[in-house]
């Protein structure tokens, strides 16, 4: 799969990526890859930008290109005037660059751990301590929900700026402003 990802990155084609969770897939453009993780700019089914995802390549089971779905999505994104994102500048690997961007930008993240197929953590990255990551968690209503610590190596995927994260983040800001 690493060679396939590298080829798609060079071709800059819109693609659909399937992982161990057979119920879902993501569609968009690959922005970067380091052989372990790939960075993908996502679009929702209506052609709107849906954030960035850093995905462990080993979790990818299938990649599709040139499908009717992908062609329609590309048309819709153009129709909606969606502009392409630049890749995140990095010194080290893709995951570290993504985490640094999340920390610096105070971005609400959704994290899947150990290919669980679930949103295991939703929150703000507050600290990077070697291999350990500290997140201030929020629930789906934008309310604080404690803190969690886990190792970066447990991350299957992490994303930010999707519609879901933007909604939860907005609720958090609106509720925090009331206090």
Listing of model-derived features with the role each one plays in the protein:
Residues 37-40, 132-136:
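Short aromatic-glycine-enriched beta-strand elements
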Residues 1-25, 39, 43-118, 139-179:
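Short glycine-rich, low-complexity segments
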Residues 26-32, 120-127:
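Short beta-strand-centered aromatic/proline hotspots
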Residues 31-36, 57-58, 128-131:
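Short, solvent-exposed coil/turn segments at beta-strand boundaries
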